Amino acid sequence: VIRDHPDMILREKHFASIQINWNDKAQNLKQIADEINIGLSSIVFFDDDKLNQERIKQEFPEVLTIEIPNDPSQYSSILTNLNDFNVLQKTEEDTKRGEMYAQQRQRKQFENTVSNLDQFLKQLDIKVKIKKSNEFLIPRISQLTLKTNQFNLTTRRYQEEEIRKFSKDENFTVGCVQVLDKFGDNGVTGAYVVKKNGTSWILDTFLLSCRIIGRGVEDAMLSHILKDAKNNGIKEFKAEFIPTSKNKPAENFLSEFGFEKQDKFWVYNLNNNIKSPNHLMVEIE
């Protein structure tokens, strides 16, 4: 029907993920989340079947399940009145989100055609652009600190004015990363804040969108930050991991990179070699 019906307005290209089958709705929701690489808490479930509504509530309480009235004429007003889709300000990434999800589906399909992860990463032709904060990027950096939960070392939340203040302060470095590959532009998907305390720098904030985790971008980001510290004569670089109920994907990142635990901080000795991923290209702007 979607592909061939002459009166169908929506076509396959308008959907980020399509699950049309007889499978359980909960299973399909999980498949959608996996396919376009988003958290279940980012999904809204709108279904007129009360049994399906209850099933999703029990299986995935983090999914927003909408209570649907019996009268179909009220459906559009319910969606229109949902505050969950409202935002104070749209970033460039927001306007391209549907396109980005479609690209993510293509990446997933491509991944299934290659024999191993290393081959997949090399053939993606990943380019990482590391950018310093500026007035144009501040809204997106703030948005990432407010919304990113999974790969987020400290989960510190910063409003735009706070990011703007850090960006103008010589005792801070604020930056972000834009990630591109053969399928398209993922947009600005990572951010960091470094606090400079004399001869010791501290990684205040370090985060990456869950859509990009596992491609080596996090290693490229941290490698750049550490090299910057080393080039500025810093001998000791500190970082924190503050555990939450959602950031387990970032739990072992610092130790695996070579940091050692000292009291509440993780410390990297900048006399050591700093590793960098070799399957992607890094561009400093």
What is the role of each PLM region?
Residues K129-R211:
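A conserved beta-strand-loop-helix scaffold within acyl/acetyltransferase catalytic domains
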Residues L29-K50, I56:
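Conserved Lys-Pro-Asp/Glu-containing loop-to-beta segment of HAD-superfamily phosphomonoesterases
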Residues I38-L40, N171-F172, N231-I234:
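Short, high-confidence coil segments that cap the C-terminus of an alpha-helix
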